[in-house]
Amino acid sequence: MRILVTNDDGISAPGLAVLEQIATELAGPEGEVWIVAPAFEQSGVGHCISYTHPSILSELGPRRFAAEGSPADCVLAALHVVMKDTPPDLILSGVNRGNNSAENALYSGTLGGAMEGALQGVPAMALSQYYGSGNRDLENPFEAARAHGAEVVRKLLSATPQNDSPYRLFYNINFPPVAAGDVKGIKVTTQGCRSGKRFSAEEQFSPNGKRFIWVKGGDQQVSTAPETDAAANLDGFISVTPMRADLTAHDAVEALKAIE
């Protein structure tokens, strides 16, 4: 198996090294792992692409590249430049430092990389490690993802359903904020929505009077409705949420026919 690995935390992020280990385990001795990751931190960029300006692409070693762009840019660089003659069988994005459950999924560059892979016709999965009191002080806070990541990916590769949608499925996988041995299992979930304040902005001033803002995140330890991603994670389960790039609110289409 030939696997492309990317992320949004950047080429030097510890989670990327964890995902490289997972990918190497999946690829096996006859397989290949290619890395095309952002040269710099790209958290929160979502599915953006840099189509208004070029991106520098640097070769750092065998099958290892850094692009000065978003995770989606990295996937495009891989599929259409560095791997154009040897395309990947699978794209893995992550392992993100922090959860991408609930509304975080909407902002996530980690998911943006996986989504672009799916739009390009390649099976893709985003992997994220929830941080909380149960794992942030561990020697390796990513140990749940490292221990269980390959198993989850294998199960999804063998179980992916056939569908007639033009939008290929991709998967949002979130590992709970616990030690590897405390993971309770896997739950297939829907995307949750946390109640109360989500992201916000705080106004501040520099010593010379310049005005600026800090974007602040909401409470990540707030659970969501049962059977959703964040609820599963905070209960010690790995969440797997199947996703597509189709943003249509299908439940509203019929109700809106009256305006035609």
UniProtKB/Swiss-Prot annotation:
Source superkingdom: Bacteria
Molecular function terms from GO: 3'-nucleotidase activity; 5'-nucleotidase activity; exopolyphosphatase activity; metal ion binding; nucleotide binding
Catalysed reaction, written as an equation: a ribonucleoside 5'-phosphate + H2O = a ribonucleoside + phosphate
Enzyme nomenclature, EC number: 3.1.3.5
InterPro entries listed in its UniProt record: SurE, SurE-like_Pase/nucleotidase, SurE-like_sf
UniProt: a divalent metal cation binding residues: D8, D9, S43, N96
Enzyme class: hydrolase
Pfam families membership: SurE
Cofactor note: Binds 1 divalent metal cation per subunit.
Cofactors named for this entry: a divalent metal cation
Subcellular location: Cytoplasm
Keyword Secreted: no
Keyword Metal-binding belongs to the record: yes
Main location: cytoplasm
Keywords for the protein's UniProt record, in alphabetical order: Cytoplasm, Hydrolase, Metal-binding, Nucleotide-binding
One CC-aspect GO term: cytoplasm
Family: Belongs to the SurE nucleotidase family.
Role description: Nucleotidase that shows phosphatase activity on nucleoside 5'-monophosphates.
Name of the featured protein: 5'-nucleotidase SurE
Organism: Ruegeria sp. (strain TM1040) (Silicibacter sp.)
